[in-house]
Amino acid sequence: EVIVGYKINSLGDVDSIAACFEVDFKIFIHWNDPAFVGKEKGPVKKGSSKLDPKVECMNARKLVTYSEECALKNPSTGALKHSMYCRGTMSMLAMDLYMFPFDCQNLQIGVKPNKKDIHDVVLIAGGECSINSFPRNEWQCHGHICRSYHTDPTNSSTGKIYSSLHIILLMERESGWYVK
């Protein structure tokens, strides 16, 4: 079981035609590794945990990871925290143009473990899940939520089930951008 939290710092440049948006965010991944029980609290070398879920963004178009750090948070349980600070362009996973330009969009950041099936990693939303208040430019944020999903084994060449987590931001276009 892997707990995933997030903090959205900013969001903008929603492009309904190119089906993408710009986002600045942090992802926090928490898991326990018994191999770290009794070790010294503090920074941990990346990749040193055999149970590292190796979480990645599945709808990244041009995403840059500016910093990554992993730390042992609780030596008595082997609790580890991996933090990633990312900024860039994400593809829209779902888009509705029914009321364009008077539209709302569910902008999503999808995360999944790299090549680890549900027997190894199950992603669960938890911990810090927040969005900074940022200037209401063209879009206004009405809320955010996290949802866990599992793939259909019939769509997999190996018949495996994979876990994923979607951070969903409900955005509405400000009326000043389409009413003159």
Question: Residues of each region from the PLM?
Answer:
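Non-transmembrane, solvent-exposed beta-strand/loop segments in proteins
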Residues: 1-180
